[in-house]
Amino acid sequence: MKLNKLALVLGLGLSVVAGSALAADQGHGTVKFVGSIIDAPCSITPDTENQTVPLGQISTAALKDGGRSNSRDFKISLENCTTETYKTVQTTFTGSEATEVLEGSLGIEGIAKNAAVVITDAGGKQIKLGTPSAAQNLRDGNNDLNFAAYLQGSASEAAVPGDFTAIATFALTYQ
């Protein structure tokens, strides 16, 4: 009888250990939290801090003789803004300039050639690289800074088909 009880206890103990071992390997992972603290009256939302704006597949016919694609809207969203000290914000875009296409435009890299990305304000006015946008009023809470971009063809050379990328960085200046 003692032997049966001992076997029962050992059997139960082994099943608990075996079950725990199986349960421990049913999935695991890591959650990494990243960010930065900035000295500014607004926070930039994570989904608009680094973004991709798809310009689409643009025909060479649309870019002929300095033609352009349709504009694609994008925005930089600010949250938790306070206007105690600063009332406006300007945005400055920088990147590799394509002066041969249009002064202040963003050069493209890749197989495609003879075109450039033009960044505009919400009203369609070009924001030249390295030049601050017009000041936009801030309000307490959340704010969207609205922009657009399009692909501009060269007026002197035919656009070369192929994939391209163009990367601009932005900096905000509060007044």
From Swiss-Prot:
What Pfam families would the database entry show? Answer: Fimbrial
Give the stretches traversing the membrane: none
- Taken from the UniProt record, the cysteine pairs bridged by disulfide bonds within this chain are 42-81
UniProt-listed GO biological process terms: cell adhesion involved in single-species biofilm formation
The record's InterPro entries line, in alphabetical order, gives: Adhesion_dom_fimbrial (IPR000259), Adhesion_dom_fimbrial_sf (IPR036937), Adhesion_dom_sf (IPR008966), Bact_Fimbrial_Adh_Pro (IPR050263)
Q: Which domain of life is it from?
A: Bacteria
Q: Where in the cell is it found?
A: Fimbrium
Identify the stretch annotated as signal peptide in this record: 1-23
Query: What would be one Gene Ontology cellular-component term for the protein?
Result: pilus
Keyword annotations for this protein, in alphabetical order, are:
Disulfide bond, Fimbrium, Signal
What is stated as this protein's family in its record?
Answer: Belongs to the fimbrial protein family.
Q: What does this protein do?
A: Major structural component of mannose-resistant/proteus-like fimbriae of P.mirabilis.
Instruction: Name it.
Output: Major MR/P fimbria protein
Give the organism the record lists. Answer: Proteus mirabilis (strain HI4320)
Q: What is the lineage of its organism?
A: Bacteria, Pseudomonadati, Pseudomonadota, Gammaproteobacteria, Enterobacterales
